[in-house]
From Swiss-Prot:
Function field: Removes the pyruvyl group from chorismate, with concomitant aromatization of the ring, to provide 4-hydroxybenzoate (4HB) for the ubiquinone pathway.
Positions that bind substrate: 73, 111, 172
Keyword Oxidoreductase found: no
GO molecular function, one term: chorismate lyase activity
Protein name stated in the entry: Probable chorismate pyruvate-lyase
Matching SUPFAM superfamilies: Chorismate lyase-like (SSF64288)
Alphabetic keyword roster: Cytoplasm, Lyase, Pyruvate, Ubiquinone biosynthesis
Source organism: Burkholderia lata (strain ATCC 17760 / DSM 23089 / LMG 22485 / NCIMB 9086 / R18194 / 383)
GO biological-process terms attached to the record: pyruvate biosynthetic process; ubiquinone biosynthetic process
Length: 198
């Protein structure tokens, strides 16, 4: 399944200037929650579930009208109590009451439980970009930092999942603590830290 992420700065190849860790995590397939679980104990905190309009760079990706109502789910994924990822997912409102209705009942379970356990779900290519102030994802990520100083930009990725032709798009913004962990410990848990996962 193809996803035209070339609009609004989203692209399949990470931009020059990304570190090796950033290139890896922006293009790594499979469940992001499962990858985070290798670093420590993952917790999912739901910060918002609501009906809303899509962001300016989302309608084309899910083939919807700019003001079409969406079911929106936003969460913070923390590892050992520290926020590592802010995630924003949307599905057309009708689909959220139909083929994607289970996303409304997840509570604090990760969306990955729906996306990677169903053989009828297809995933597009991952696309990524840097987000800066002015993009709604930047505000979401900054809020996830809980008052800590935000960097000039965040690295983010997104992809579209389809089930019976109905889209669900997941956008994931990596927070500074993830890169600090990888710099210090590589792709494994902190020395002596708790393991586990979601």
């Amino acid at each position: 399944m193809r996803f035209d992420g070339g609009q609004a700065g989203w692209r399949e190849t990470p931009r020059p200037g990304c570190t090796l860790d950033q290139r890896d995590w922006l293009t790594r397939g499979g469940s992001l929650t499962a990858h985070l679980a290798r670093l420590g104990r993952v917790n999912v905190r739901v910060t918002r579930e609501a009906v809303d309009c899509p962001w300016f760079d989302e309608p084309d990706a899910v083939a919807s009208a700019p003001r079409a109502p969406m079911w929106v789910r936003e969460v913070i994924l923390s590892v050992d109590g520290t926020p590592y990822v802010a995630a924003h997912s949307i599905a057309p409102l009708a689909a959220s009451k139909g083929v994607w209705q289970a996303m409304r009942r997840l509570r604090t379970r990760p969306l990955a439980e729906l996306l990677y356990s169903d053989p009828q779900v297809e995933r597009s290519a991952l696309v990524s970009r840097r987000v800066i102030a002015g993009h709604p994802l930047y505000a979401l990520a900054t809020h996830a930092l809980g008052g800590a100083r935000a960097p000039h930009s965040f690295a983010a990725r997104r992809s579209v999942f389809q089930r019976h032709g109905k889209p669900l798009m997941v956008t994931e913004c990596m927070l500074p603590a993830l890169w600090r962990h990888l710099d210090a410990h590589g792709d494994g848990p902190r020395s002596g830290g708790p393991g586990g996962g979601a």
